[in-house]
């Protein structure tokens, strides 16, 4: 079988310790509806971001989740589906689009 990669424009954000401050609007809206939750840990009395979890509410995927760690990317495709892509894979699969 022969396969061809589907090229499409996507929106992406990299998970960093300051994701709360740099998150785009679509990411913030998903956080407000609790589809995306920021994972935090308390270390030596300070709370730090360790990643985030994406929860699926559709009946077909009820109870499913994706976990992203610091450095991973959350990718939103043209249909609105979210996916987690590791940094090495993201650099290989996606190129920054010129504005």
List PLM regions with ranges.
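N-terminal non-globular leader segments, chiefly Sec-dependent signal peptides
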Residues: 1-59, 63
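Short, compact, well-ordered microdomains
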Residues: 60-99
């Amino acid at each position: 079988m022969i396969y061809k990669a589907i090229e499409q424009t996507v929106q992406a954000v990299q998970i960093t310790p300051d994701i709360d401050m740099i998150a785009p609007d679509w990411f913030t809206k998903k956080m407000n509806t609790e589809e995306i939750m920021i994972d935090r840990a308390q270390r030596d009395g300070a709370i730090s971001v360790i990643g985030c979890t994406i929860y699926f509410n559709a009946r077909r995927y009820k109870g499913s989740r994706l976990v992203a760690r610091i450095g991973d990317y959350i990718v939103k495709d043209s249909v609105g589906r979210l996916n987690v892509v590791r940094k090495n894979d993201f650099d290989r699969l996606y190129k920054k689009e010129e504005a």
